[in-house]
Each structure stands twice: as structure tokens, then as C-alpha cells.
């Protein structure tokens, strides 16, 4: 079991978002939102050097919150969260411009992705809000 600390950002009165730090070559101080309400993990499409598009990728329109956004699919070869590396992760790719605009109002954190239930389920995640940590099986 891997234990990883997370931070909680309050984006308006009583709307809390747990964030874990991510590392990618050439990117400092980037964060993933732990989003157990998201069925699939999502990554910022603008970070092209950090993923490979699926060969049979098709542009799809998907509801993300109230908005309809273009979605593509791809794979991140390596995902480093905290001090731990997790193998390849299939991801949906969307433009995170609007997400980072909202976060900029309340925080200086750059969001690069949402960790969804696909990842949380496959790693038997346990979120401990009291101690601000997530436990993951590798």
C-alpha cells in the first residue's frame, strides 16, 4: 500500500477539492484533482509531450460539469504522484483552460488532470480526509 499526502483547496464556500502533486519532466508544481465523481481520469490536452494519442482516436463531445467539451483519448506512459510511479494510464484529454482559470481565482496551483474512478478503483484507493492522505495499491 502506498500512502500519498494530499492538500485540500476550497474553491468557494464549502466546496472542497483534494489535490495531489504530480511530476512530469519539464513541469514543476502541477497537481491532479482527486475526483471520485469522475468515471474516467482526465488530462490536459495542451500538454502534448506527456501523452500519446490513441491511434483510432476520435473527437467526442462529452459533458464535463455543465459544459460540453471536445474529448480525445490517449495514454500517459508514466504517472508519478508523490514519490510513487504508477504505470501507463489511459486518459481522456480535454482543454483545462477553464479549469485553471477557476483555480487561479482561489489558488496558485496548476491543474493538469483529474484522477477518476478508473484509477481509484484499479488501485483500491482509500481517501483519508482527516489525515489528508490517499492509500493506493500499486
Predicted regions and their residues:
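Pepsin/retropepsin-fold aspartyl endopeptidases
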Residues: 1-138
